[in-house]
Amino acid sequence: MPPQRVAVIGHTGRGNYGHGLDIVWRSIDQVQVVAVADADDKGRAAAQQRLKVKNAYADYRQMLKKERPNIVSVATRFLDEHRDMVVACAEAGASIFLEKPMCRTLAEADAMIAACEKHHVKLAIAFQTRLSPRLERVRALIAEGRIGEILEMRGRGKEDSRVGGQDLMVLGTHIMDLMRYVAGEPRWCFARVAQSGKQGVRPITKADVREGGEGMGPVAGDHITAMYGFDRGIVGTFSSQRSERRQGEDDRFGLQILGSRGVIQLTTGSLPPVFFLADPGWFPARSKAAWQEITSAGLGKPEPLKDGGLGQGNIWIVRDLLDAIAKDRQPRSSMYDGRASLEMIMAVYESQRVGRAVELPLKNRQHPLTML
């Protein structure tokens, strides 16, 4: 079988090449990188040299037409370009490895998925943690009953300079995906989006809506609290709130899974920090229970794998994408996962807009902040 022809789309100065979505293909045997597209002249020349490709294009559409790749890395982080790039790739018959978050709105996500379905191509999104062998161990421990019945999940963003709306979009997308990995599809969301000021913390208004960075569209608020309802009575929360934080202090980014017999706490990455606490009271200072690390080998066992960072996660994703293409199945980090994570994010703003809990999937496919 001839190698798969791979092309790369980046945009220097506007999201560049994401978190290594261009160079991941160096580690994959069954492919040949044939071309790169970048609208920036200097960036394009640098990428051509970095990827060791003969052909480089200013216009990605021209590249798709001339090179006819089987797979394309849509690597730029700027979301305002994702829909058009993905639809063009799908129409050219190419499967896609896409930087996260998926796009700006559910309407855009719907259009991207419709194009991929129509042209029978696959799309894998860069949720590196979803492919982590440590996450597989987490699911196995939950299935074994090690934390008992799941009662609650608590997620937080990084709460750095992006606190609030931008944190929700950029880092919240990972937390939403982890919640779904653990508990399945959410059924409802109730949220409050607020803004701090001289008069304290108040609900957002239209005047608080601003354009987020990296082409992500409108964002708002610096105090966000969201609650999600899952099957079996499981509740998940996501928070991102402005507070005092000193330079160099650890952030609170990650997810806690709280069960009737214990707790699992994790963050993101190819081999993320993951720990288990056998304490039904969730109070180790009282119980004297000790946290145990969960590795790819199991609970309390040494980690046999080397942590290759997000790059290793990308390798696992594209290997799975190649297998998904060969077997005509959905990737383990699919376009449907990308849309579902975005749906949970949009539900936060929709709940704030209508002033009540909203059912998922959302009926409103436009950005709720444009409707205030």
Annotate each language-model stretch with its function:
Residues 42, 266, 306-318:
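Active-site loop of classical SDR/Rossmann-like NAD(P)-dependent oxidoreductases
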